[in-house]
Structures are given as structure tokens and as C-alpha cells.
């Protein structure tokens, strides 16, 4: 098992489990990218309902919780990544602030089980970027208030 760290917030510096590169299709988003993304979001994360689609190890959603999100829904279909994600949620003690959905993102959206979210993160597998599924995620955003704007972040490597 490898590890990555939570960058900032209440869990800043804590290590999260991550798979060894050869053991899974999951590759956590790099620390520099996560840091830049969360610096861009700033205080919008405070109290937010967040969706971490294609969650992998949960590094992005757990960073969101660390920085003040109220709740994160993680959606991940890979069984190895799900186990690591579940262990990471437990190790930080955020079971009441997190919900893990074990399903492909597209199937979960189409099942009607998805709610509405303030912020959505999508980091699909590089070899299967699932652009049509990512575009469906826009429909899960809560409508912004007059003073808000919505941003969408998707990492393409």
C-alpha cells in the first residue's frame, strides 16, 4: 500500500491509503492539482454538499471534508478502490459526513438515486474518460443563487 496526504484543513498532513501503481486502475489526483483546485474554490467549500464522482481512494472528497464541506457522496465502482476509500473514511472518522456508493457513475445517475450538489468533482479513468457521463453530472448541480457562480472541474491527463 502506498499513501498520499490531505493537504489542508482539519485533517491537513494526515496520510490516506492509496494503491500501489501496479495493483489497480485507480491513480489519485496529484497533490499540486488538488491544492490548486481547492485554492481556486476557496470558502465556497464551507458547508457544501459535495459529489466526488469516480472517487477512487477519496482523496478529493476527503480534502473537501477537511476544508469544511458538510457532506460528501463518493461514487466508485472499482472494488479495490472502494475498500481503500472505505478505510480512508474510517481512519479520518468521517462516516457520518460521507456516503459511499458502489456503482458505476452513469448507472447511479440513471437509477435516480442522485441528489443535488453544490460542488461536483469528476476524475474519471484516463483510458475511459466517459465524457457523456461527465456531462450528465451538470444536471446534479444545485441552481446557483444570484451571488453564486458554478464551476466545473474535471481533470484530463
Language-model regions: role of each:
Residues 1-151, 157:
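Class I S-adenosyl-L-methionine-dependent methyltransferase catalytic core
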Amino acid at each position: 500500500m502506498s499513501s498520499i496526504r490531505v493537504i489542508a484543513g482539519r485533517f491537513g498532513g494526515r496520510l490516506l491509503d492509496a494503491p500501489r501503481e501496479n495493483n489497480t486502475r485507480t491513480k489519485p489526483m496529484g497533490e499540486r492539482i488538488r491544492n490548486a483546485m481547492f485554492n481556486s474554490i476557496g470558502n465556497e467549500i464551507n458547508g457544501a454538499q459535495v459529489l466526488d464522482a469516480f472517487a477512487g481512494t477519496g482523496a478529493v472528497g476527503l480534502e473537501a471534508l477537511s476544508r469544511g464541506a458538510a457532506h460528501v457522496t463518493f461514487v466508485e465502482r472499482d472494488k479495490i478502490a472502494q475498500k481503500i476509500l472505505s478505510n480512508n473514511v474510517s481512519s479520518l472518522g468521517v462516516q457520518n459526513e460521507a456516503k459511499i456508493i458502489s456503482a458505476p457513475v452513469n448507472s447511479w445517475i440513471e437509477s435516480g438515486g442522485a441528489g443535488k450538489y453544490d460542488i461536483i468533482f469528476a476524475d474519471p479513468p484516463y483510458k475511459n474518460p466517459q465524457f457523456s457521463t461527465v456531462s450528465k453530472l451538470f444536471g446534479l448541480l444545485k441552481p446557483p443563487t444570484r451571488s453564486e457562480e458554478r464551476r466545473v472541474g474535471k481533470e484530463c491527463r
